[in-house]
Amino acid sequence: MKPLVRLATLCAIAALPVHVCAQGAAPAAGQSAAQTQAYPNKPLKIVVPFFAGSDLDPVARGLGDHFTTTWGQHYVVENKGGANGQIGTGYVAKSAPDGHTLLICSPGPITINPNLQTNLPYTVGKDIVPVSLIATAPMVLVASARVPARNYAEFATYLKTNPGKAFFASAGVGNVTHLAAELFLRQAGLSAVHTPYKGAQSVIADLLGGHVDFYFNPLPSARTYIKDHPDKVRALAVTSLERSPHLPDVPTLNELGLKGFDVNSWYGLCAPGGTPQPVITKLNGETTRALSGGELPGRLRGFGMSPQATTPEQFDEHIRKESAQWAAIIKEKNIKPE
């Protein structure tokens, strides 16, 4: 994460009203300082805006366990999937801004949907505000064994000599697995045909079955089948600037010649707009403590993630930068929602 850029400067650059960039409004009228200090005073609801089984589930449970241990309040993880995270994110946006309903956020609902959809039930920065990044994970360029390539160089040569004949899969139009592939193809000067699926599990089944040629898969969900099926798929590269300790023998696209290529899946904590600033601060501080020691960092690493806490302002900067990147790709490729 780059050094902190003051939020006021970011707002000025983006020509946005200050209230849109605020990380949490002042406590609402009638809410006493004592109430804020007593937070949390009832069980927490941590919403995952995807169906059960996504990479976000262990993040939600790990953070919830820490909050319960620290604050003595129980929590429930509620999966509200659908529309690439829109439904669950919209639910949190409309929830009471008291810090008791929280969102585990990720690129789809936060940096992609606002650039792809025209009628979102929320505005990022106004209805949904960042609290802290929690973890990041690179994506893995996974090729089917049907592709005659044992490494990235051979893979790139295959695509170059067979323009428009290779097929890449995604978990859906506009999904981060789609946009990462488009960014790769643009930067590498290659071409391939997009084959969108309705969810990652279908992609993985067809990738293992040899029905598609390659897929950019977040490491947490890719690492198991890569290791279990070396005869069916090959991990050719990772999308982070540095190699992953989970796949130490797999090079980065950056070191393979795509200088500066850096695309990561990430997992963060967000809250409803209007959440009192003292509550945002308390949540951020406890998230930072959770990621600095204890059980949570080890649990996240066990899923292929790298723990990374930020201030709300740093997380906001990260969101803005990534949103601009995806906006450019969506416009250039004329990507439309299904």
List PLM regions with ranges:
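N-terminal (or domain-start) structured segment
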Residues: 23-126, 165, 173, 177, ...
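Short beta-strand->loop
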Residues: 123-133, 169, 191-195, 213-214, ...
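Sec-dependent signal peptide recognition
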Residues: 2-10
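Hinge/capping helix and adjacent helix->loop/strand transition within the periplasmic-binding protein
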Residues: 94-100, 107, 115-202, 253-255, ...
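N-terminal signal peptide c-region/cleavage motif recognized by signal peptidases
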Residues: 17-19
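An extracytoplasmic/periplasmic, membrane-proximal ligand-sensing/linker region
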Residues: 27, 31, 35, 41-43, ...
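Beta->alpha turn/N-cap motifs
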Residues: 104-109, 200, 216-222, 238-241, ...
